[in-house]
Amino acid sequence: MPKLKTKSGAKKRFKITGTGKVMYAQAGKRHGMIKRTNKQIRNLRGTTTLFEGDAANVKKYFLPNQR
């Protein structure tokens, strides 16, 4: 049986670290930032760790060969 293909949308959005955690970029920085404080905008920078339950689903269904 051949390997399962990775979902191309998931490989653009998620990255798996060496320890197996799933990292993602935070949403909410595309437009409409005039309404937000500088602190809110600053806190949206960089990447964040996905919660363990969600990370398990991402690894199982969307990134099957990256475990």
UniProtKB/Swiss-Prot annotation:
Transmembrane segments: none annotated. Keywords: Ribonucleoprotein, Ribosomal protein. GO terms for molecular function: structural constituent of ribosome. Coiled coil: none annotated. Signal peptide: none annotated. Pfam families: Ribosomal_L35p (PF01632). GO terms for cellular component: cytosolic large ribosomal subunit. GO terms for biological process: translation. PANTHER family: 54S RIBOSOMAL PROTEIN BL35M, LARGE RIBOSOMAL SUBUNIT PROTEIN BL35M. Belongs to the bacterial ribosomal protein bL35 family. HAMAP family: Ribosomal_bL35 (MF_00514). This is Large ribosomal subunit protein bL35. The lineage of its organism: Bacteria, Pseudomonadati, Pseudomonadota, Alphaproteobacteria, Hyphomicrobiales.
